[in-house]
Amino acid sequence: MIAAFFDIDGTIFRNSLLTEHFKKLIKYDLLDFSEYDRRVKEAFKLWDERVGNYDNYLGDLTGTYVDAIKGLPTKYNDFVADKVVELKGNKVYAYTRKMIKWHKAQGHLVIFISGSPDFLVSRMAKKWNADDFCGSTYHTDKSGILTGEISPMWDSKNKLKSIHKFCEKYQIDLDKSYAYGDTHGDITMLQLVGNPKAINPSLELLNSIKSDKKLASKTEIIIERKDVIYSVDANVKTIDSTF
């Protein structure tokens, strides 16, 4: 069986599902904005002005998010998760939207593997007709209250474990399979398959691809800006953004 493994945030979705969920929780007065303002605002400002690191912003955001949703009842969380995918689920890259449809038409398995919360990943998987999915598990107690305990899926080590589980479940031929990712957390996913695609890759991911001769030789790099989609190889020239 041939599979196509897709990361979601920054690969399919043009933003972060966790970010959108966080904003909606604040909008519906389920979380205190002051915590976001105190812990995340400055990191976002630096990233937004392109003088800060996106990973630092996401790290601050994720930590704040995990702390903030502790104690939130599942019924409220599910309501907001539904709204996020209903209102934002179509904000995807044209290239990966096209490739999801292409893989389905070829009879390939489409599998979403994301570091976003499983309750968001499951909804995106359903919306885009994915065959299976895996996200970060946000645990609840017996009463359906979020505990703040997480089994993460945003790092390369855990994504590797998930792919091996999917391979056993579906008898996947990795040499013929595809993977799509945008950050260094996707590196093992790209290394495992015969057809890796880096979508608007971060500098860290791009440098990792360049330093791995085997991976560099088989990776297609896709850059989508405005209404143009570019396809380049790992030898693409980059320009230092610090002046």
For each of these PLM feature ranges, what is it?
Residues M1, V80, E86-F243:
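C-terminal cap/substrate-recognition subdomain and adjoining C-terminal extension
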Residues M1-I8, K23-Y36, D240-F243:
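Non-catalytic pre-domain segments flanking phosphatase-related domains
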Residues M1-L18, L190:
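Asp-based phosphoryl-transfer active-site loop
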Residues G10, N77, F133:
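A residue-level signal for conserved active-site and pocket-lining positions in enzyme catalytic cores
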Residues F13, I69, D155:
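Catalytic cores of large soluble enzymes that bind and process phosphate-bearing ligands
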Residues L17-L18, L30-W102:
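A metal-dependent, Asp-based hydrolase signature
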Residues H21-Y28, K127, K169:
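Active-site catalytic microenvironments for nucleophilic, acid-base chemistry
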